[in-house]
Amino acid sequence: MKSTLAILATLVTVLLLLLFVCDDTSFGLKSDNLNGNSLAPQKSADKQSVKNIAIENQWETYSSQWFYCNHQKETKGVALVIHGLNFRPTKMKPIIAKLTESGVDALNMSLRGHGENFTHQDGVDSDKARLEAFKATTYQVWTNEAYLAYLQVRERAAHKEVPVFFIGYSLGALIGLDLFATYQDVYYDRMALFAPAIKLYAIHYLARLLSPFPELIVPSLAPDSYLTNKKGTPVAAYDALFDGINNFEKSANSKINVPTLIFIDEQDEFIPTSGLKNFVEEKKLDQWQIYTVQKGKDVKFGTFHHHIIDAASTGKDVWQEIMNAATAHLLNDRKN
């Protein structure tokens, strides 16, 4: 039922927006204070040029936050954590709390247009500035940011002489995976992926029809408490998502065949479980396992099946089981 509603909502939203779209697609918000290409170096750019551009745009100040493990004597791993599309990066904290409790340091990154990752200027409303950054983003921008975050994680892991882990939800999982497959110097020892957006139900690609209007905002059906931009998601962000999926389909290779645990609700409104299983089989990813999530009875009615990132979205007991499975997977063959 929930999946049907999501599909109908997608159809209705796309049709309505196509009917009523006008020249002023920014809905009263202008991009005067932001340069959409300011964080988008070419793929051939060297690491230092990427880093310089990011620093100029306040990246290191606003796009990542470290959380250190509670074990002062031993760190068992260092994890890169990336959130989903138009999701508050802080919503990854329940996962991070379990990681740090288990002896894993975590770097929680915010993609451009999410959390505090936007150009901060005196006298400019934060919500508007964040949304403008969201409307100006591209998949390459997000990839560059994720790469910079990975370098920090790798450096700390090397210093501690511990494994590098990757934790990604939805869009975040896609970006981390594509980074792994595409960049020769990126490597994760183990991964835990939550509803990875590497496959979508075909109906959602209807949003591609809105590509000529990148600044147009598509309203979201998700609860405000999860949304980093409550007004909705810009078409530009959806285009970036589709670009990422397309890129990953081309780049996916045997390099990503490391111990990986995928958490997915079979009733997910956006990610087809069958598509994930087919991908694993086609790419011969014999170290990947799928963990089917069944939400508990204590979950609020109407909660998206795609949301499996905290106790509120899965149920308290189910969330505990998910976290136990995730940490057991990441810390395999290591003392707990």
Please identify what each model-predicted range represents.
Residues P163-F165, R190-A192:
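Residue in the alpha/beta-hydrolase core beta-strand immediately N-terminal to the catalytic nucleophile
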Residues Q58-D122:
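Short, surface-exposed "cap/lid" segments of acyl-processing enzymes
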Residues E132-A157:
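Alpha/beta-hydrolase active-site loop
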Residues D178-D189:
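Conserved hydrolase catalytic core segment
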Residues Q72-K73, K230-V299, T314-L331:
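Serine-hydrolase catalytic core
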Residues I167-G172, G176:
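Gly/Ala-rich beta-loop-alpha elbow adjacent to hydrolase catalytic centers
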